[in-house]
């Protein structure tokens, strides 16, 4: 099963650096931006991250309400990098 990394920081933050292949969907755009996930099975592992974990946590709750079941609040880039070995 594949993983999807969603960087929920604002676009200007995303532009300063993000994981290769990460999708940028800020919380304010999550409902509209979730179209990027249309073909994604609801049980795909989705790791969300931001700067401190607050935005990724609220975004995780929204995605859960949309039916996604395998969600991880990765907190921030450093913790995601340490746990998943992504660059």
Model-derived regions, located:
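Rhodanese-like catalytic fold shared by cysteine-dependent sulfurtransferases
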Residues: 2-4, 8-47, 51-87
């Amino acid at each position: 099963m594949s993983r999807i990394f969603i960087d929920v920081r604002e676009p200007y933050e995303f532009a300063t650096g993000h994981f290769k292949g990460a999708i940028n969907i800020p919380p304010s755009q999550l409902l509209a931006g979730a179209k990027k996930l249309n073909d994604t099975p609801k049980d795909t592992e989705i790791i969300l991250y931001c700067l401190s974990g607050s935005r990724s946590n609220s975004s995780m709750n929204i995605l859960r309400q949309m039916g996604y079941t395998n969600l991880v609040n990765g907190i921030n880039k450093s913790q995601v990098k340490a746990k998943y070995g992504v660059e």
